[in-house]
C-alpha cells in the first residue's frame, strides 16, 4: 500500500487561523505556519510557503473567509465592500495561477444571495471548506484517468511539484503514481530538480519518497540524455493556467521538456482540474507571466552562486503550445488534438451533467 496519507496536508482550516505546511523549509524541516490575517495569507503565497495552483486557491479562499469573519460592517453593503477589497488584495498575490481567481470568484458567487452579514460569513467558510473537499476528489479522478495512459514498468518524467502538497491530496501530475502504487504497477519517476527554486528536488523527491514511490532525481539539463538512456515512456506535468486553445502555463522549464519529448516522440501530458482552464483567454500569449526576485537565480539556499550585480531574467513560468501536448488530463476525462473544440465541448458537457 502507498503511504500517501502520511504526507502532511499543505493547508488546513482551523476556525481562527489557517495552518499551512511551510514548503520553503522542506525537505530538511517539517514546519507548520499559522496564518491569522490577510497579510499572513498574502505573504505565504508570495514567498512560496504554500504553492501549487490548487493549494494556492484553497489557501486564498480560506484567507478570504477568515478575513470576512472579522469584518465589523455597518450593513451588508459595507460587508461586501470590505470583502471586495480583501479579494482584490489576495488576488494580486500571484498573477499566473488561475485557480486563485477561480476560488475567490466562487466565494463571491456563494454570497450573492445572502440576506445578512452572519449568513454571508457562515456561507463563505462553508464554501471555502467545500473547495478543499472537492479538490481531493478531483485529484483522485485525475489520477484515475491518467493511470490508463501508463503500463507496468513505465519510466516517466516530470518537473516541478504537482503532487499532494500542491493540492488538497494526491496532486495532479503525481496522482496516478499514488494510485499505481496501490495497484503495484511499478511506475518509476524521473524528477527534474526545477531550478531556480528546486521544487523538484526539495518537494517532489521528498514527497514521493514519503509515499514509498520509486523516484530518481536529475538536474534539468540532464532531461534529454535521460530520455534517451532511460527509455522514458512519457512526460507528465501540472499546470497553472490553460488557455482556450490548450496552451499551458506551467513552471519554467516545462516548455523545454515538451520540445524534447516531441523530438524523442514521447507523449507529453498535462494534468489539471477544470478550475485551471481560463476560457476567457484565446491563447498562451494572453497569460501573464510572473517574474520573481533575481536572487532566486543568484543564490541557492541563501548562498551566492553568481556575481551580486549580474542582471537576471527570472520568469516563474513558461507557455507550452497546445501543439506539443499529447493530452490534457482532467477529472472529467482526457482531451486530445483539437483543443479549442474539445475543451469547449468538455465544459458544455459538464454544464449539462
From Swiss-Prot:
Q: Which InterPro entries match?
A: IF-2B-related, IF-M1Pi, IF_2B-like_C, Initiation_fac_2B_a/b/d, M1Pi_N, NagB/RpiA_transferase-like
Q: Name one Pfam family in it.
A: IF-2B
Q: State the superkingdom.
A: Bacteria
Q: Where is the active site?
A: 240 (proton donor)
Question: What UniProt keywords apply to this chain's record, in alphabetical order?
Answer: Amino-acid biosynthesis, Isomerase, Methionine biosynthesis
Q: Which GO BP terms apply?
A: L-methionine salvage from methylthioadenosine
Q: Which reaction does it catalyse?
A: 5-(methylsulfanyl)-alpha-D-ribose 1-phosphate = 5-(methylsulfanyl)-D-ribulose 1-phosphate
Which pathway features in its UniProt record? Amino-acid biosynthesis; L-methionine biosynthesis via salvage pathway; L-methionine from S-methyl-5-thio-alpha-D-ribose 1-phosphate: step 1/6
- So where does substrate get bound? 51-53, 94, 199, 250-251
Which residues are marked as site: Transition state stabilizer?
A: 160
GO MF, one term, reads: S-methyl-5-thioribose-1-phosphate isomerase activity
Q: What is its EC number?
A: 5.3.1.23
What sort of enzyme, by top EC class, is this?
A: isomerase
**Assembly information from the UniProt record:** Homodimer.
Q: Which family does it belong to?
A: Belongs to the eIF-2B alpha/beta/delta subunits family. MtnA subfamily.
Q: What does this protein do?
A: Catalyzes the interconversion of methylthioribose-1-phosphate (MTR-1-P) into methylthioribulose-1-phosphate (MTRu-1-P).
> What protein name applies here?
Methylthioribose-1-phosphate isomerase
